[in-house]
Amino acid sequence: MRWVTLGNGKVVTLVFDMHNEYGWKALKETGGTRGEVKGLRYLFGSQVAIFTLDPESSRTRQVPVDGSVVISLDQITVDDIAPLQDELRLHQTAVEAAHLVYTRYGKNWLEQLLAYGDAGDIKGLAEQIGANRESLAALYRKLKRVADLPFIVPSDQKPKKDIVETIMRYLQSGIHVVLEFGRQGSMLAYLLVANILARRIHEMYVRMTEEYLATMDPTKEPRQLVIVIEEAHKFLNPYAAKQTVFGTIAREMRKYYVSLLIIDQRPSGIDDEILSQIGTKIVAQLNDERDIQAVLTGVSNPAGLRSILASLDSKQQVLVLGHAVPMPVVVKVRDYDECCTTVSYELANYIPEVQDRIQEEEFEQLLYESDDGADGGARYEGGQSQIEERWREVFGEE
């Protein structure tokens, strides 16, 4: 993530932040004491935008947000329901019934289904579209949970500004986007929102790419987008991968300037075809035989790597293999606090706002001097609080 953020501006990221960890601050997990660690917006300021599904939660946590995400019922398609089958316990016949409703009512299919159900006339709808009444009734009961989510609104209440178009403007301006879920961090909300937004953004990228290829105008070339998703097996299991946009993106191999960065603790749940498309894998300690077999599929010398995976330090080491390295290599991962310190040190080199507004001499003085005149590491540590204070003066702390 840090590599992408500090890159040359040609790559942007969209992070679906289920647990509110990437954007502003998160709880410190190591060291034996409770505390906070800085998120991407805190570290990189205006290079990162935060959108939220839960404005109240963001205000409570004093998170500076750039916009709130609201989804209207007419923005939800039947394909967006496919990843929810396990969460909603939807039978395949109910999904087939949804397709019948969509055929009859188009983008208003969900609103019409809810209207008939609320009126107690599922039987009338079933007769009208030729669907099984029991399947349609089950579909109504399950999707009622979706309609009751706080960020879902009727079609006539959707905001005038399309939130997806707003996010796209940020991305095409070179600004990375973190979408935090606040207290709406249920798997149901995560699967639904990630699929809806990623599907629409992918559709826009397809149009932009086709326009660029037709004109070969350099100004129309889309920025490469990396979409970050957690719990990837929920989107990319053998069933969902064939129906969701994430399976499409994985199979297209960056054809439309969109790539996936997938995070998962159960790689064995991911479709084999999708696993074969992953260019670079960063693997922490694994003990489950199925998971080990999944990540090593198609890799030379799997037996040797198998023993390495089982012996990795669970919090300090990872195995990197694939396109990014000439051969599999074990890497010691730095603590996040150490990474934050390094980012503070590198701000003057990487962030234009700091280059423009904090002169190099001032930055050097802040970094290497402290009141007690200590040298070496002590001077470095002593200057950090001053750097952070100056950072807040530059970008503000809402």
Q: Residue ranges of each PLM-predicted region?
A:
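Short, solvent-exposed amphipathic alpha-helical segments in soluble enzyme
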Residues: 194-198, 279, 299-300, 336
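Conserved ATP-driven motor cores of ASCE-family P-loop NTPases powering translocation/secretion/packaging/pilus
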Residues: 250-332
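Short C-terminal domain-edge/linker segments immediately following a structured domain
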Residues: 29-32, 44-48, 83, 207-214, ...
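Long, charge-rich low-complexity segments
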Residues: 135, 240-255, 368-376, 381
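Conserved P-loop NTPase motor module
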Residues: 315-398
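P-loop NTPase motor domains
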Residues: 1-15, 19-39, 43-248, 314, ...
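Repeat-unit-sized solenoid/scaffold elements
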Residues: 7-9, 82-96, 118, 256-279, ...
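Short, glycine-/Ser/Thr-/acidic-enriched flexible segments
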Residues: 55, 184, 232-233, 267, ...
